[in-house]
A protein has these predicted regions:
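A short beta-strand-to-loop transition that corresponds to the Sensor-1 phosphate-sensing loop
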Residues: 81-82, 218, 265-269, 289, ...
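Hydrophobic positions in the central parallel beta-sheet of the AAA+
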Residues: 214, 262-265, 285
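Signature of the SF2 helicase/ATPase Hel1-core->accessory helical subdomain module
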Residues: 51, 97, 272, 278-336
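Short acidic, S/G/P-rich loop/turn micro-motifs used as interaction or catalytic elements
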Residues: 44-46, 269-271, 293
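Conserved helicase motor
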Residues: 219, 241-251, 266-272
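Conserved motor-coupling elements within RecA-like helicase/translocase cores
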Residues: 244-263, 276-280
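ATP-dependent helicase/translocase motor core
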Residues: 1-211, 220-236, 258, 262, ...
Length: 336
């Protein structure tokens, strides 16, 4: 993966494959002899064939008749020349998506030019290797029937956040701990982006086995995120993925920890009496809905008949307890 030029990339058109039946996929992408992508194309001008026919041909006929072709498959592509989508062999049709950008700063591209956008944006050699390395997810309990591949916003966001975290981490002399904020609308797959980012961080040689703290501000969100992450230990690369239930447990897990671990908790567990949990620099705090939980670090003063009362938001206690951590925010609401 580190040396793109040491890999052999081939695309083969109309290769006859004999299994239960003889099938002829329109295109197969090979990396070092392994068939990692299978493509099926239909014509946009023929009324009797559609992109849905391409989907059925791949996920039903080819899967049934030439299953050996998919032993090393990462994802499949369906196209009618105008509509161009990709997904895994187990992805429902409604969740096949186009790759709409070549670079993260480009405008989304649909229509006739979108096939070229997919080729340049997804099949560039180093881009394809990156997807194969970090962006194809098998849940731990999938039993081979579940597999997910990133969408292009998740891919770009993960890489941008990863590079920003490395640049701003306190492992650097001039690091300020500002890992960045990701804005994504509801339904854009923020939790999967968090998962892809966590995998890249845990595998980073620069961060040397970091500890990841995932923070939400509601118990139901915490439970949802925990269910996903606890089922991704192989993907993340760490057996210690724990949904933290109490402040006491949070302290026991973080104090004295030298490396590793992914801990999910709510912001409310960080209170005035939490004190210092760790001064390590390779701790990454990732907050979901950060506009609600990470903007209240200033002091609030209220005057009552009992005198002046000073208080802070939970975010202040979080930063005090992990002073050298790098902080990353995910939100569906734009914040400054």
């Amino acid at each position: 993966f580190e040396h793109t030029d040491r890999n052999i990339f081939k695309i083969v058109n109309q290769l006859e494959i004999v299994g239960q039946e003889k099938r002829i996929p329109d295109g197969i992408v090979y990396v070092n002899g392994l068939p990692v992508v299978v493509m099926e194309f239909k014509s946009a001008v023929k009324e009797d064939t559609t992109i849905m026919n391409a989907f059925t041909q791949l996920t039903v006929r080819y899967r049934r008749d030439i299953p050996n072709l998919f032993h090393y498959n990462a994802f499949v592509v369906i196209s009618d020349g105008v509509n161009n989508k990709y997904g895994t062999l187990f992805t429902p049709y409604d969740f096949f998506y186009a790759w709409r950008k070549v670079e993260s700063t480009d405008k989304s591209n649909d229509g006739i030019d979108s096939l070229l956008t997919m080729v340049e944006g997804l099949f560039r050699r180093e881009r394809l290797l990156s997807v194969l390395k970090d962006f194809v997810f098998f849940p731990d309990n999938s039993k081979g029937e579940q597999k997910m591949v990133c969408r292009n916003p998740q891919f770009f966001a993960t890489h941008l956040l990863y590079e920003n975290i490395l640049g701003h981490s306190h492992i650097n002399i001039k690091g300020d701990g500002k890992g960045g904020t990701y804005f994504g609308a509801t339904g854009c797959g923020k939790s999967m982006t968090m998962l892809f980012l966590t995998r890249m961080l845990m595998r980073s040689r620069h961060l040397a086995s970091p500890t990841i703290v995932l923070i939400t501000d509601r118990t139901d969100l915490d439970d949802q995120l925990a269910a996903q992450f606890v089922n991704a230990k192989l993907f993340v690369g760490d057996e210690t993925i724990i949904n933290v239930e109490t402040r006491k447990e949070l302290g026991e897990l973080l104090r004295g920890r030298k490396s590793g671990g992914v801990f999910l908790t709510t912001i409310h567990k960080f209170s005035e009496d939490i004190n210092l949990l760790s001064d390590r620099a390779n701790i990454i705090c990732i907050s979901d809905e950060a506009h609600r939980s990470q903007t209240n670090i200033s002091q609030n003063i209220s005057i009552t008949d009992k005198g002046v009362k000073r208080s802070y938001g939970f975010a202040k206690y979080l930063h005090d307890s992990l002073p050298n951590a790098t902080y990353v925010g995910f939100t569906g609401t734009p914040i400054d």
